[in-house]
Amino acid sequence: MQSVVIDTNIVLDMWVFDDPRSRPLDEALRSQGLRWLASAEMREELLRVLGYPHLVQRMVLRGVSSSEVLAQFDQHAHSVPSAERAPYVCNDADDQKFIDLAVAHQALLISKDKEVLRMKNRLARLGVAVLPVWVPLA
């Protein structure tokens, strides 16, 4: 089973914004076709971000609560300890935890963050593929 690390913005795309591009990833997680690795630090970031006023408004419009989003996270993510610092450092310190975990577990990193995407070639040298959208293999 393929291991993945999922950036917070992708989680929001799945369960707050209902972005159609994130549906295949959501379906793969629900069917247990992927093993999503996440640390407590990643869950804490999601909890913090879900309190942002513009996201609270969006969740109200969609009839989704932050506790429901966190319940989805808890149901689908496999909790693992935070990883040691990877050899490459991201310009955005908030994204480093995702990079570190992906490198430590040789997992696919799903992120549309520009700073992470800029590191795509360097991370590939460490065995980590970075994709802005997960698409199942045909």
Question: Positions of the model-derived regions?
Answer:
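Alpha-helix capping/helix-boundary segments
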Residues: 10-11, 42, 115-116
